[in-house]
């Protein structure tokens, strides 16, 4: 109720040392037992962070901020480090005043496939905000936005930029207001891809994703560059001499990835040679 009233009345919280400008939010490593005002309410909260790991560093962790505790099990190559970044209110409400603090524990994963577990502390409570498949130290923070680089496995392994936003909302449950906080990815229209492969069959290309007019055909046995993709269904390809360029359709919703060739969905391994995937 306090937060809803604050938003409706456009009141500001007292500024704290943890508050940061949207342009220069700083990621900090948090030690077990650290204390501070992590939600801008004028009181001090203590952080307790403990991991339980086996000889392979697999296991779980427990995070307590103030009087709220969360736990996570079944992590792979779990780190003992905890990071946090202050999240200010949007300027529309109260510029630079502290909305809360995003805490991040993380695992390195089975094959350098990191996952950060994100928890948002605000108004005296700790909320599960979701995950980001990147290390906290590989992220940049701009208010409620987080920018990083993610791994993609469409027609090979490559990296793409990603932006996440911390969403928030309120709902009435009985006589009380419930708060919700969750990270969601902001999709891009297309991403730079930059992989080179070789065709096993002729590959027709079309002019655009919405115009199926022919843009030419890559011959069988020819090399081509996957230049861009929406990371869902469309890949923009170009012949090595740059004379033929256009789009083709893929479906990666299941294994194996399928490529549309002359109206027929065909396994990507039957269409392309030398697709490079990391383990």
Residue ranges with predicted function:
Residues 83-121, 125-196:
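Short aromatic loop motif centered on NTY/YTY
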Residues 1-7:
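Positively charged n-region of N-terminal signal peptides that target proteins for export
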Residues 23-25, 68-82, 130-132:
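Blade-edge motifs of beta-propeller repeat domains
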Residues 186-245, 257-279:
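Beta-loop motif signature
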Residues 31, 56-63, 114-116, 159-161:
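Repetitive beta-architecture junctions, highlighting loop-to-beta-strand starts
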Residues 14-26:
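Sec-dependent signal peptide cleavage junction
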Residues 36-47, 55, 93-104:
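Acidic, glycine-anchored loop motifs typical of Ca2+
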Residues 29-33, 87-89:
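Signature of short aromatic-glycine-proline-rich micro-motifs recurring in repeat-based ectodomains
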């Amino acid at each position: 109720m306090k937060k809803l009233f604050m938003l409706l009345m456009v009141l500001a919280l007292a500024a704290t040392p943890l508050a940061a400008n949207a342009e220069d939010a700083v990621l900090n490593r948090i030690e077990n037992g650290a204390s501070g005002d992590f939600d801008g309410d004028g009181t001090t909260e203590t952080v307790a962070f403990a991991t339980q790991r086996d000889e392979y560093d697999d296991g779980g962790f427990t995070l307590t901020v103030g009087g709220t505790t969360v736990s996570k099990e079944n992590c792979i190559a779990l780190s003992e480090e905890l990071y946090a970044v202050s999240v200010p209110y949007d300027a529309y409400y109260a510029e630079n005043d502290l909305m809360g603090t995003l805490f991040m524990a993380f695992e390195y994963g089975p094959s350098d496939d990191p996952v950060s577990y994100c928890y948002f502390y605000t108004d005296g409570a700790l909320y599960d905000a979701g995950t980001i498949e990147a290390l906290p130290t590989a992220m940049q923070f701009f208010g409620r936005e987080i920018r990083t680089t993610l791994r993609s496995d469409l027609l090979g392994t490559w990296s793409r930029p990603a932006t996440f936003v911390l969403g928030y909302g309120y709902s009435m449950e009985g006589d009380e207001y419930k708060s919700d906080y969750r990270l969601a990815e902001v999709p891009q229209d297309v991403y730079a891809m930059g992989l080179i492969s070789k065709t096993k069959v002729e590959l027709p290309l079309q002019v655009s994703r919405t115009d199926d007019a022919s843009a030419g055909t890559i011959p069988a046995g020819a090399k081509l560059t996957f230049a861009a993709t929406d990371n869902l269904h469309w890949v923009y390809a170009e012949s090595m001499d740059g004379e033929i360029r256009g789009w083709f359709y893929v479906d990666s919703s299941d294994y194996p990835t399928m490529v549309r060739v002359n109206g027929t969905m065909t396994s990507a391994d039957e269409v392309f040679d030398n697709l490079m995937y990391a383990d």
